[in-house]
């Protein structure tokens, strides 16, 4: 898959745009992970994916990882957390929703920055955190 070249500086990109991209990137990683684990029934996949992508799960992942994030990534997290979204959380409290947005913004920022190895590292940590909850 060929990526189009972006000339936009990820540091100047609206954090909600970063979160939009991060949501898609993280969801893709989750779905691939679940299929690799052997889940093939659509209903099973949907239920299992929700366990990873819910606002509550993403907030927990972010709060667990925050003490280990470098300053550059923490700045992105703060921008994402403080971004004013036009929508509200459907099935989450506002605090979890904001932290989930911050997590997605971080993933989007890393994607736009071309830091795919760092995304893989964070995603693997996220999977371990979510799977350790059961």
UniProtKB/Swiss-Prot annotation:
Homodimer. GO terms for molecular function: ribonuclease III activity; rRNA binding. Its cofactor is Mg(2+). PANTHER family: MINI-RIBONUCLEASE 3 (PTHR34276:SF1). It is found in: Cytoplasm. SUPFAM superfamilies: RNase III domain-like. HAMAP family: RNase_Mini_III (MF_01468). Pfam families: Ribonuclease_3 (PF00636). Keywords: Cytoplasm, Endonuclease, Hydrolase, Magnesium, Nuclease, Ribosome biogenesis, RNA-binding, rRNA processing, rRNA-binding. This is Mini-ribonuclease 3. The gene is mrnC. The active site is at residue 23. It is an enzyme of class 3 (hydrolase). SMART domains: RIBOc (SM00535). GO terms for biological process: rRNA processing. It comes from the Bacteria. Its EC number is 3.1.26.-. InterPro entries: Mini3_fam, RNase_III_dom, RNase_III_sf. Belongs to the MrnC RNase family. Involved in correct processing of both the 5' and 3' ends of 23S rRNA precursor. Processes 30S rRNA precursor transcript even in absence of ribonuclease 3 (Rnc); Rnc processes 30S rRNA into smaller rRNA precursors. Its main location: cytoplasm. GO terms for cellular component: cytoplasm.
